[in-house]
Regions:
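Active-site-adjacent beta-strand/loop module that shapes the phosphate/pyrophosphate-binding cleft
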Residues: 22, 79-103, 113, 117-119, ...
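Short secondary-structure boundary/capping segments
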Residues: 7-8, 16, 32-34, 83, ...
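Conserved N-terminal beta-strand and adjoining loop/helix that marks the start
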Residues: 1-25, 44
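Conserved Nudix-box catalytic region and its N-terminal flanking loop in Nudix hydrolases
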Residues: 23-64
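Short, charged, solvent-exposed linker or helix-capping segments at domain edges/interfaces
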Residues: 102-108, 123-127
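A generic structural signal for short hydrophobic patches within well-formed alpha-helices
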Residues: 48, 120-121
Length: 145
């Protein structure tokens, strides 16, 4: 018996930035061959540097991709993200409320915008992220519209 599924190649941190109406900031990934979730809408995030803790990773990556600095990140979950045909990685997710003050810019990917939960089916979003979005809304005590 092999443990191929346990070959985790790295650690990734991401942030679910939500508005009080439950909309979530999502980034449209570039359409590049070899890019995981290419052409899909996902929350901003990225790989941890060596010896970097995951909350610092998520905050740094979010700033690098959006210019927005999340100052009150809260842990959601951590799990091994496995997609067929790709090496797996450890994904750690955090969330924060959008302060409605700082400007958000698209510094990576094709586009970035807040998507309303009831319109999520109009976008190519990985299904597991929809479940995590719903969990985050419960944690934040926001009712889905």
């Amino acid at each position: 018996m092999t443990n191929d599924y346990k070959q985790v190649i790295g650690r990734v941190g991401a942030v679910l930035l939500i508005r009080k109406n439950g909309s979530l900031l999502m980034q449209l990934r570039d359409n590049k061959e070899g890019l995981r979730h290419s052409g899909k809408w996902v929350p901003p995030g990225g790989h941890a540097e060596q010896s970097e803790d995951m909350i610092s990773c998520a905050r740094r990556e979010f700033v690098e991709e959006t210019s927005y600095d999340c100052v009150d990140l809260k842990f959601i979950t951590e799990f091994e993200d496995r997609v067929e045909g790709w090496p797996s990685y450890e994904l750690t997710l955090f969330w924060d409320y959008y302060d409605e003050i700082q400007e958000i810019r698209c510094l990576e990917g094709q586009d970035i915008k807040f998507i309303r939960r009831e319109e999520a089916n109009l976008y190519d979003i990985p299904k597991y992220l929809l479940n995590l979005w719903d969990i985050t809304l419960k944690i934040a005590n926001i009712k889905k519209e």
